[in-house]
UniProtKB/Swiss-Prot annotation:
Biological processes annotated in GO: mycophenolic acid biosynthetic process; terpenoid biosynthetic process
Enzyme class: ligase
Species whose genome carries this gene: Penicillium roqueforti (strain FM164)
Gene3D superfamilies the record matches: N-terminal domain of ligase-like
Function summary: Acyl-CoA ligase involved in the biosynthesis of mycophenolic acid (MPA), the first isolated antibiotic natural product in the world obtained from a culture of Penicillium brevicompactum in 1893. The peroxisomal acyl-CoA ligase 891 converts the intermediate MFDHMP-3C into MFDHMP-3C-CoA which impairs its diffusion from the peroxisome. The first step of the pathway is the synthesis of 5-methylorsellinic acid (5MOA) by the cytosolic polyketide synthase mpaC.
Pathway: Secondary metabolite biosynthesis; terpenoid biosynthesis
Name the record gives this protein: Acyl-CoA ligase 891, peroxisomal
Localization of this protein: Peroxisome matrix
EC number(s) given by UniProt: 6.2.1.-
């Protein structure tokens, strides 16, 4: 049977095309420059008007899902791997169809409203519903249920501390939190500090045929007795909604779709107010970048409390793709991918770095014929990719992809993937190009923030450069503003440099109940200050070069961007899994605290020390970290990396401390999105940092033996 392409997908394909010869990807609009500010830039195909939606009939996240559910009711929608208590393992994927999800979300949404009426916490207009769970089908069913009734979700990271959870629930005045089993006891414990909370809805069953008083429900209700807290399961609420006969209460484009709390690297989380219009504009651009269609499969494992993952799932829904959720253990993600065989993959540089290290270890670093063949293939494909004629440049090879790259991608479960997308942090150019040629896949880098619904720039598939995050999405415009204190100017040559400002249909409304932060972040003429320092090349590609907020000043007056240095170290030294570069204003050089990846560090330490250290022997790995031979070997590697990347003398790291996982969410040094919290890190490791400086000074002043 012949199926015509839906209007929105046809429009996406049209907007995906390359610009005419001689036209940049992002174009400066004539006459828009101001003193200290660059011209306004827009996508080449959005110069007259910014994109709002690919389909005028679709203006909300509710519409995105509903339109696909009506068009493709029998298609697979959400999948999961059930836990098998007999085998103590996870079974193959099971799937809910779009029709089933549509019915469940309608019933659940109606039931949530009924509960708010029942417990006297219903409010006129919009109100929020808390969502605290790891990725799973019910997470998405809850979010879809909320938008079906013009409610909005307030997502809470699954690994968030109790203090941060308490802050978010109180700040957003939640009466109801939908959560998974592990968090119910925490909510009951926090209830005395949560005056607005009245309803907990469990995504997991609470009754399993136990004798009276012995079920999970009985235990939780006993704990909650006298606290004014009612506990339900999702099944109960769906039944309540079904019985109510309550229909949809669909939202409008200007309504709130979610309040997404930022990770809070320097203070309490900020509630980013995002609208349905923001969601549709960003999703439209997502479909332009990566294309989705019936039969496609998406893997869900990045935290759905992060807007990057939310955008990925909106895009899958509008493309009628199916979404398979990982079984909960990120260390076993590849097992899920091998079953899912996703047609695309969205991730972050940290995971791509691990992929790159694993691929190198299994191919180009192998001895003998296998290693030689792999190096030849990588060299040949790299030459093809860098062909000076753009029309002939390609990451694909008819023979080598079939006999070699297919095995590489199959080992990761990505043999069907047409694309890989990297976001949330810069992707090292060397790693970027290696992944392209090793997998024969379009590897695209993008840039976005919570405030931009994760969408701002993205590399088009026809551009094979690295070291940039692509051109503007057609829903947003940008400009740069000079930063004299950091010596960045929009008049710099050959390209303007300055802080990146964004404005457009995807941009957030405000910070919830925080006028001061909103006024600080948004200019009077509507531009959002990203805090990222950027340059724009001749093709209209955006390159992040610095971060305004995370700049150190050393004793000699030199400014340092530690995040840039950390990114280079992480990309160059595969055995380093975490990096913190520190500069003291009273010192003239840098020191660092690095977390190692035991599986990759053990062979390295074995070689340095001349004895075998098993990757599984964590005690032996930790012992090696304290060996001065190992420290000095790592310092030599850091010096080599510094020379390769032409670091200035004051940018070179003069001393290090090596640890296994020094920064975690649990010790409050990482945000739930695994971003380093710099001020708390300094506080926790103040004594160690002082010792590193003392040791480095002693070693520098010690007399050197003459040869």
């Amino acid at each position: 049977m012949f199926f015509s392409q839906p209007t929105h997908l046809a429009k996406a394909e049209e907007l995906k095309q390359a610009p005419p010869k001689g036209v940049a990807y992002s174009v400066a609009l004539p006459g828009t420059e101001q003193p200290g500010r660059s011209p306004v830039y827009r996508a080449w195909n959005a110069q007259k008007e910014l994109l709002t939606t690919l389909d005028p009939e679709v203006t909300t996240a509710h519409d995105i899902f509903e339109s696909t559910a009506i068009r493709h009711p029998k298609n697979d929608c959400l999948g999961w791997r059930p836990y098998n208590s007999t085998t103590k393992s996870f079974d193959p994927y099971q799937w809910l169809t779009y029709e089933t999800v549509q019915k469940r979300r309608a019933a659940f949404g109606a039931g949530i409203v009924e509960l708010h009426h029942k417990h006297d916490c219903h409010r006129p207009g919009q109100y929020g519903v808390g969502l605290w769970s790891q990725n799973r089908p019910e997470w998405q069913i809850t979010d879809l249920a909320c938008v079906s009734q013009s409610l909005y979700s307030v997502s809470i990271y699954d690994v968030l501390s109790e203090d941060a959870t308490e802050y978010i629930i109180n700040h957003s005045e939640l009466s109801c939190v939908v959560t998974s089993l592990p968090h119910i006891a925490s909510l009951i414990k926090l209830k005395p500090s949560l005056p607005t909370l009245k309803i907990i809805i469990s995504l997991d069953p609470l009754d399993g045929g136990e004798q009276a008083g012995h079920s999970k429900r009985a235990i939780f209700e006993s704990m909650a007795a006298g606290l004014g807290l009612a506990i339900y399961t999702i099944d109960q609420v769906e039944e309540l909604g079904l019985a109510s006969k309550r229909g949809y209460n669909p939202p409008s484009a200007s309504d709130i779709v979610t309040i997404n709390y930022t990770s809070g690297t320097t203070g309490p989380p900020k509630g980013v107010v995002l609208t349905h219009g923001n969601a549709v504009a960003a999703t439209s651009c997502g479909l332009i970048t990566i294309s989705q269609a019936r039969g496609d499969t998406s893997a869900s494992y990045l935290p759905l409390a992060h807007i990057y993952a939310r955008l990925a799932e909106h895009t899958a829904f509008w493309g009628a793709a199916r979404i398979g959720y990982f079984h909960g253990n990120i260390a076993e993600l590849v097992d899920d991918l091998k079953l899912l065989k996703p047609t695309g993959f969205m991730s972050v540089p940290r995971l791509y770095s691990r992929f790159g290290s694993a691929i190198r270890a299994a191919t180009v670093e192998q001895p003998g014929f296998k290693g030689a063949l792999s190096r030849h293939i990588i060299a040949a494909k790299t030459a093809n990719m860098k062909n000076p004629d753009p029309s002939k440049a390609t990451v694909r090879h008819a023979l080598y992809d079939r006999i070699w790259a297919k095995k590489v991608t199959a080992a990761l479960g990505l043999e069907r993937a047409r694309y890989m997308v990297s976001g949330s942090a810069p992707l090292d150019p060397t790693l970027h190009n290696f992944l392209r040629v090793a997998t024969g896949t379009d590897v695209l880098q993008g840039y976005g923030l919570t405030e931009s619904y994760a969408s701002a720039t993205a590399q088009p598939v026809y551009d094979l450069t690295a070291g940039n995050c692509g051109s503007l999405a057609p829903c947003v415009e940008a400009c740069l503003v000079s930063l004299p204190d950091m010596e960045y100017s929009v008049d710099d040559k050959p390209f303007p440099r300055g802080e990146l400002l964004l404005r457009g249909n995807n941009m957030f409304r405000e910070y919830y109940k925080n006028e001061e932060e909103t006024r600080s972040a948004i200019t009077e003429d509507g531009w959002f200050r990203t805090g990222d320092v950027c340059t724009i090349d001749e093709k209209g590609r955006f390159i992040i070069i610095d971060r305004r907020k995370n700049v150190l000043k050393l004793a000699q007056g030199e400014y340092i961007s530690p995040e840039r240095l950390e990114g280079v170290v992480l990309s160059e030294l595969g055995y380093i899994a975490q990096a913190y570069v520190h500069g003291d204003s009273l010192q003239t050089f840098l020191v660092g605290i690095f977390g190692v990846a035991p599986d990759l560090f053990a062979p390295y330490a074995s070689k340095v020390l001349g004895r075998t250290i098993a990757p599984t022997d964590l005690e032996a790995v930790k012992e090696s970290l304290n060996d001065d031979k190992v420290r000095r070997a790592v310092l030599r590697d850091l010096e080599r990396v510094a020379k390769k990347h032409k670091f200035a003398g004051y940018e070179r790291i003069r001393n290090v401390s090596l640890k296994v996982e020094p920064f975690t969410v649990e010790n409050n040094l990482l945000t739930p999105t695994l971003k380093l919290k710099r001020p708390p890190t300094v506080k926790v490791y103040r004594s160690l940092l002082d010792q590193l400086y003392e040791q480095a000074v002693e070693e520098q002043s010690a007399p050197k033996a003459k040869l």
